[in-house]
Amino acid sequence: MTVLSISPVGPHDFELCLRNARSFSPGLFQDLTVFRTAVRIQDNPTVLEIRQIRRKPPALEIRTALPNNASEIKRLARWIIFADLDLRPFYRIAASHPILGTITKELHGLKPMRPASLFEMLVIAITEQQISMAAAYRIRTRIIERYGERVNGLWVFPTPRRLRESSVADLMTCGLSRRKAEYVKGVAHEVADGRLDLGRFEAMSDEAVRLLLLQIRGLGPWSAEYFLVRGLSRPDRVPADDLGIRSVVGRYLGRGQRLSPQGTLRKLSAFKPYRGLAAFYLLAYERMSKYHAG
């Protein structure tokens, strides 16, 4: 057993992060003291266990059965939990706002979480198009269990090569429409064959990534913006076509009604360069409020 520790940029309330993740995926994260996820590190499937061991300053412990690769284990753990995201500049901007200032105080230390790979994030961006997150989660679970690897009771997301070898008909049995199955298989081809180098993305500008993604069949403006804000941690990006975001921004920052995409961006403009983070906090506040009320 390998035991490591990391120090995220504070504030970082890991239990609050798990509570938020649970509100989006009911049934998961019942134990709010530890996060378990199956990942692949240098082609070795393993399970990471991450728990907070100190709040101020924040410190987290990582456990895994993988004996080596300490630097890669730490890097991947930091990536998944947004350990290097500094919330303080956003909090300073939000503090003067009567609604978001209150929400950021209540959710102090909340950060998003993301999948272990950008390829998985691309598949998420495809599966979540125009359906509920719950339905998309069920579809992805079937994809993972059909094409992934099982390790210590959890499933590792399938590799691009594995999904490239799948058939559209088989992918459709997981719940995907024919078109989405073609999109997933197409993206897997692009990545597995080296035509789409995801390793370049972190060094690229927002606009360069967006334009590149829009050239890929099945990835439109919503998917590109969602990939940027969640997958690449670009905190000013907003998938403003998203009905949920348009509704929650209208409810808390507007007159209570769903806004247009342009109206959504206008209302969030006060929080530049953290518009995406502002939208995330509004969504998290609403989801957690509903979860606890229910």
Residue ranges and their predicted role:
Residues 1-294:
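HhH-family (HhH-GPD) DNA N-glycosylase catalytic core used in base-excision repair
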